[in-house]
Each structure stands twice: as structure tokens, then as C-alpha cells.
Amino acid sequence: MSVATSDMSGAGPEQAKAVLIAGPTASGKSALALRLAEARGGVVINTDSMQVYRDLRVLTARPTPDEEARAPHRLYGTVDAAQNFSAGAWLDAAAGALAEARRAGAMPIFIGGSGLYFKALTRGLSAVPPIAPEVREAVRERLARDGVAALHAELARCDSEAAARLNVADRSRVARALEVIIATGKPQAAWHAEALPPLLPPSEVLAAVFLAPQREALYARIDARFATMLAEGALDEVAALRARQLDPLLPAMKAHGVPALIRHLDGALSLDEAAAIGCADTRHYAKRQFTWFRHQLPEFCWVAPEEAGNYLGDVIPGRERSERARNP
């Protein structure tokens, strides 16, 4: 993996800096990013792990062709569903999009809900290579069978530093550390020492916001949006994926709604049952997004969606700080 150096030539001090818009699914991020891009001559750069897939425009709520025509959009629908697109691959692509925006003198606007992408963007990315699925599966099976204490004891024998650092009850991190040492032969600390630097250090971020709607309103919006997706062709998208007989472990095949709708197409669920599962999965994911950003990226400013336009209009200097950058 090689991350290109972003070129800041041709960009003024404001345009060279980026705006980051994160938030749970269905919180209004795309609409806000589009208004800001129109007001400031910005480029909208996808920071969502599912919206990279070209096969799922409807089911992942990618911007419509009309919306994409109103302002430049990058990294949307560029990857085939058969590809396992990693955070490292996204970071490479994001570096190119950032350099392109800066050469054009346009404000880079990173928008999405994938916390790992934002963390890689602003904190850097671990150099740990992808762990083979069979190694991960074997460790998870042992975790379920033998318990976390047994895995922690094994970790202490092969990576004592990680074992000393991790709580014996932390199932996910203990399993991850053991996966790394088994798959690569190197402890986590050695890989962390080789981590890539952030693409956007704090000095190059103009504003970073997390849209935080009221939970009940968000959940209602998620349910309504899933119904709209079905009306606009989401089932046809999933049918096309199903016909390709792709590996069900691929990221695109695990997008919210895809597994349940495939079960419907297989005759195992009614459409209403599949939709209910898709909505529930999406609501659970939104809940995890709140928790993840709160603990992993506390530097993001949490704002209500209806106040986000005003907030960005206040924190972004310049004459373009106008009603167009605000909520209508």
C-alpha cells in the first residue's frame, strides 16, 4: 500500500484544508455536504465503505446522478462488488482525490459514516496486512469454545507485551492480537511502529462534525428510507448480486439489507420480513456508529443535523459563509 502525498499547489489556505462530515446512516450527511460543496466550490469525497461499490447505488443511498451533477463527487461507485476493498485501498484512493481537489483549488469535503476510514484519514493506518479468513475463523472458534482467558494465556506466551497491555476480559482485542501474531509472525507493537502517517493531520482540517440526530427520529428515518429504497429498485440490485454467486463474506454481500433480501429471493423470508430485518440491522449499526465515534474520535464536534449548516457557516471563514452553506 502506498499513500500519495497530497499536492497543495494552487489552493489557498482555506481551500487547502478539509471539512469532515460524519454521522450515523440516514442522518442527512450527503445533503449537508452537497450544500456546502455548492456554496464553497468544494469536492465531495466519499468516506463510506459501502458507497464505494457500484452495484449498490440504491441500497447504500449513494448520491443520485442529479446530485452528483451539482458538485464534483469522488470515490462513489468505483469498486466492483467482487472486490474486498480495504481501508488501505480507500486511503490510497482518498489521497488521490485530495490531491486533485487541492490542485483545482477546491475545498475537500470528506463525508460518510465509516469510522475506520475517518480514523485512517486523521490518525494514520496500521501496517498490519489483511488477516487470512481461515486464521480469523479459527481464532474466533477457539474463543467461543475455550473462552477469552485461554486465548489470553496463549497470547502471553507468544506476544507478552500485548497480553500485558490488554484486559483479559477484552474478547475482541485479545482475539485480534492473537490473529496478528499467528498470521504474520510479528507482534502488534512491531506493526504499529510501521504505521502510515495521517493523510490529514489536525492542522489541515478546517472542521470535523458528527451529525447526532435524536435516536427515535433517526430510527424512523431509517425505516422510511428502507421502504423508499425498495420502491426505487433495491431488490433488483440484490437480485443482480445474487445471480453472480459471489462469496457471501465479501463486504458488499454483507451490506445492510443484502443478506435478508437474498433470503427473500431464496424463498426463506417474505419481503416484509426481509425489510424488517434490514431495518433492524441498520438501526443497530447506527447505534454502534454513535458509540464508536464517541470513544474513537472524540475530536469531532457533535451537532444536531438541523444546526450543522449554521455551525459550519460559523466556523468556516470567508465571504462564502452565506445562507447557501446553511440549512434551508
Swiss-Prot record:
Names of the cofactor(s): Mg(2+)
Site residues, Interaction with substrate tRNA = 114, 136
E.C. no? 2.5.1.75
> Any idea which GO molecular function terms this record carries?
ATP binding; tRNA dimethylallyltransferase activity
Name the catalysed reactions. Answer: adenosine(37) in tRNA + dimethylallyl diphosphate = N(6)-dimethylallyladenosine(37) in tRNA + diphosphate
Matching Pfam families, A to Z?
IPPT
Residues that bind substrate: 25-30
Q: Which domain of life is it from?
A: Bacteria
Residues noted as binding ATP in the record, renumbered to the chain: 23-30
The UniProt entry's GO biological process terms, in alphabetical order, are: tRNA modification
- Extract the InterPro entries matched here: Dimethylallyltransferase, IPT, P-loop_NTPase
Q: What class of enzyme is it?
A: transferase
Which UniProt keywords are given for this protein, alphabetically ordered? ATP-binding, Magnesium, Nucleotide-binding, Transferase, tRNA processing
**Quaternary form?**
Monomer.
Family of the protein in this entry: Belongs to the IPP transferase family.
What is the stated purpose of this protein?
Catalyzes the transfer of a dimethylallyl group onto the adenine at position 37 in tRNAs that read codons beginning with uridine, leading to the formation of N6-(dimethylallyl)adenosine (i(6)A).
PANTHER family noted in UniProt: TRNA DIMETHYLALLYLTRANSFERASE
What name goes with this protein? tRNA dimethylallyltransferase
